[in-house]
């Protein structure tokens, strides 16, 4: 329910953002653009109204190809057309026509540095004046030939401005520019210096607009002219008359209430459709992401042997020998056909999702380490789910007693190496989230193996923060950040805390009479306080059995120091597991005393699980 509520809240916020972006914002901008049409563009000596754009004149105020730009530093106006920047020298509105003086900006400098491309203006929008003519400039010509009116550019090579049709064959490139007809003379040899001067002066063109008074009539009737295709349309009593059959069309819109409502209805309908499509696409994306993750985990199952439920019953002799019980299910002892002993965990029947089962099988399938329990197979038939592990004769750590300090140290070091492998040695990082004595199994040589990955989470190694929707683990071993994010973010450092509590229990739980509260049942939650006090007073030896050698005392103190380092409340203060292994393998003298924890955990039974209902472990072999 938390997930669905969170997802619904995210979807609602997503819809509101889309509604603002696709409806309210465009509507506001379109209204501003519409009423900005009454203000002419002004820059330096240039004043221009319809059909030009620029300044506060929006896209609806004129033709999209006639957008003017103002350089406020030089007070000059420019126009971009067909890939060229033009300086607008003047705009002349006389005799119901618009004449522009234009100069290509790349011709303002040396001719050889200009763009050797033709000046092309749309014949539908612009009309060439008879006083100007097109001049062809040839370049990249054959240097072995002689050309009249030639010039040489460093990059473009030999060129000519003589209008000779045969030059087009002898030269690799050419382009055309407008020049006054008086400049072009086929008889005389043209000079490049003269051409540069003429090009800087620019040329004139006329707009193909039939009528100019249209904007004044539009504004007097509180309407606006829009540029479409044809000529100028006038509004008289909400009717439209168009002048001329050629050129571009100007349409007026009178902002009456009915037209505004129709426009709003069209805009809302269109954008609601877009929003619905995007929401559906978003939900499909989320579903695909979840399915891809589940598929990725299921693919890991293929590498392990799959047993039928009938085979599982045969392996366990119809579930006759129970070796452990727990919140997730019951563990039975069994034998494979080759004689190997196995532990078979039968998960409780569930018709819901199988995430816990997939987590455990997928996690263990990706591991291969001497300190990680080996997965031998699984069963997945509808609601029947089972996991087959190697069987370890000595059961779990919590059932083992009378272990000497050296053996305890070897177990603690092995567990540290196993967790380090989960965090750094696998293709994907595995965070266990339930490190405790019941989940540390011992083989015939008392070598430890980390087991029970039902609460594990797989993530990429670069992920430093994990997202969890529930608190998982066992009270007394759960890191503070799993209870409240005020302590920090959940990460692989949560396993470090659990490991520290495990090590402290291995050392401090040996003198249970030290705990003053008889009802506390020696909860591991109280270890840090009184162990730290004994450590400060130099009485750490009292935590262990009598008759220890000096070497065993040093080992015990090192384990205590490492444990206290691991249970720091802030995750950033805890060492990573690879550093923990180094501390355990290193010398006691190289370890600095850790800071004293400022808080202590609530008093609880250390076998209670917060993520799942727990049951009392009733055998020598805990649930794996």
Swiss-Prot record:
Active site (catalytic residues): 434 (proton acceptor)
Organism superkingdom: Eukaryota
Membrane topology of the entry: Single-pass type I membrane protein
Compartments where located: Membrane
Cytoplasmic side: 285-624
Classification via PROSITE patterns: PROTEIN_KINASE_ATP (PS00107), PROTEIN_KINASE_DOM (PS50011), PROTEIN_KINASE_ST (PS00108)
Composition bias, Polar residues: 603-624
Binding-site residues for ATP, renumbered to this chain: 323-331, 345
Entry EC number(s): 2.7.11.1
Protein name, as recorded: LEAF RUST 10 DISEASE-RESISTANCE LOCUS RECEPTOR-LIKE PROTEIN KINASE-like 2.2
Organism: Arabidopsis thaliana
